[in-house]
Structures are given as C-alpha cells and as structure tokens.
Amino acid sequence: MLVKTFQSLIDFVRYNASVMRCVRDPQLLKSNSVHRGEACGEVYILYTGSSLKGKDLGWLAGKDIIATNLFCLSDQYNRLDIKHYSIIEPWNYRNLTFLSFFTDLIMLRRKTGSQPTLWLHASAHHYIGQKRLHYEHFSESLLRALNVRLIASQGDFADDSEVRDNLSEVSNVAVGAMFFNVFLAMYLGYSKIYLLGADYTKSPIRIGHLYDNWQQTISVGELTDIAGFDVHGLTSKRNQKMIDFAAAKNVSIINVVDRDVCSPLFDSVYYDELSEGC
C-alpha cells in the first residue's frame, strides 16, 4: 500500500512538472499556425447535448465538421468525416486510463478513411509517448496516422482585458469545450459557425447527453444548486463576450435549436429547417 501511494505521488509530481514544461515550450504551440486561416465559409460544431440523440445527421455529409468530447459515442459518428476533434479540458489527462480511453474511442470508432486533426491540451504531451498508454489498443500507431495538435490556455477571456485567441501561443479561450471549439473555428478561418447539441445555451435548459438515457429540464436556480455556483451567469458572460468578439470579426455564430426551445443569446435556426434545406 505504501509503495503504491509513493508511486502515485511520483507520478503526480512528474505529471505536473511535465505540464509546466509543455506549457512553457513555445515550439509545441508554434506549429499550430499552419492551421490559422486555412478554411472559410461554414462549419458545424457537434457537441454532446441530448438534443442530438436519435437525430439522423446524414445531411452533414460533405460539410466541414468539428466534434468534441464524447461525441464519438454517437451512433452517427462513423458516418461523418470529422475535420477536427477536440478534447482540451486538462482534467482528462490526470489519469493514463482517461486519455487512453478517449483517444481510442475517437480513433477506433471514426469513419473509415477519416483523419481528423486531434486537438489536445498540452498536458497530454507527457502521456502520448508513454508505452503504458498504448499497451492494449495500439493507440500509438493510430495517433501517428492523425495530425495531433496541442494547445495551452491560461486565464479566462471573459475576465481578462483582451481575448487571446492565437492558438499558436498561450491563449485564454480554452475555458471549456463550448467556448474553445468556437474560437478554434474562428482560428481556422470559418465565418459562419453552427452549434449543434449545445444544450446549455438554450432555454429551457436541458441536462443530459446524446450517449446516455437521461434528460432533465431544469431552472437556472436548480442548475446553480447542482453546480454550487452561478453556472448560468458565468456562461452567459462568456457567451456574450464571445459573440461580440466574433461580430467584430464578421463571424456569425448560429445556434441550431428544436422548436420547443429558444436561444436567448445566440442567433438561431430551427434544426428541421436547416437539415431539410441542405
């Protein structure tokens, strides 16, 4: 027991030391600049809200798509050519099992022939080269087939005096998947960004995911009680600043909603109208 505890302590220290080295290594981020402005036009960001459960996303064929977090658990995932996939919250890398599990799901379940660029937090760099991560599922060879990019973020763009959205440097926009993926889309050069499955941005608020069998409509007060802080107030502040930042760049962010909900902050379009018009 003592040996196991000591080894865990060593792993923890090594992990945090590696994270600090990665964050301070400008070369890890500098290479991201090859993606800056590489795209144009429309992009569709696929989040994991329960509103996407059961929907046929075949109409997205041929379109530019960014997916995030555990969208790979959707039964639609292997039908789509994903251009970019992001898992950027650093807590995902606190344990080798988490990173191995997520990357294996993303890579093994993807559409045959699809080669998305995989965006990870710089803290993942410590693990990618470790044999322990790749022992069971041959992730190492799969990762070599993908374009892996690392990002680092410090601060919160909503509170800081400026938005640091240059992903080839230390930014302040990776404060959650909801926000990072929009800033990623802008960094890539897209001018029209559609949000699908971003259920926390809608009213009424529905919690749950496309990959589970649970959905619940809750009030702002109930969400605050669950989280222990004013989630709605914080996310609304971030969303509004992000909307204003995008507008200054002539970028439109459009929330795709069902007919029984509305989008208080973002411009919106009904899902059925968008999908049937494609």
Give short role names for the model-derived ranges:
Residues 1-278:
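Metal-ion/cofactor- or nucleotide/acyl-coenzyme-handling active-site neighborhoods
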